[in-house]
Amino acid sequence: MNTYTVKASDIKRDWHVIDASGRVLGEVAAEAAKYLMGKHKPMFCRNLDCGDYVVIVNAKKITVTGNKLDQKMYYRHSGFPGGFRQEKLGDLLKTKPLFVIEHAVKGMIPRNTLGAQILAKLKVYEGAEHPHASQTGVVSKES
């Protein structure tokens, strides 16, 4: 019996909507990464982008466990002397909740050119409204 090799023309992409209200950041990011990479499909192939589109709604209502709101720090550097900046997770969730979710999902995606294609299929929105209502057919029920 021969091994079946997936071709790019065989890949069918679905749209998954994940409601993040009241859910933990890591759980939402892990679920989104699974759908984005296509690991939930029986024809998963590492060298092809066989994942689905993911829409995450209610990003402002996401929760974290423990003392992460006060203790978890996000770092960046501008490249100039004295350009080191750091922000707490609690402050970022108030100002840029989309960045927090995108950053968490990005950490769970492969760090190569295929990872950039995979991450392009992620759509995150602060509220419950999103412009992809006509494409979405699958609503995630995992919690």
UniProtKB/Swiss-Prot annotation:
Signal sequence residues: none
Keyword set, alphabetical order: Ribonucleoprotein, Ribosomal protein
SUPFAM superfamilies attached to this UniProt entry: Ribosomal protein L13 (SSF52161)
Family matches, as CDD domains: Ribosomal_L13
Any one of the GO BP annotations: translation
GO molecular function, one term: mRNA binding
GO cellular component: cytosolic large ribosomal subunit
The family this protein is said to belong to: Belongs to the universal ribosomal protein uL13 family.
Subunit structure: Part of the 50S ribosomal subunit.
Its job: This protein is one of the early assembly proteins of the 50S ribosomal subunit, although it is not seen to bind rRNA by itself. It is important during the early stages of 50S assembly.
Protein's name in the database: Large ribosomal subunit protein uL13
Species, as recorded: Dehalococcoides mccartyi (strain ATCC BAA-2100 / JCM 16839 / KCTC 5957 / BAV1)
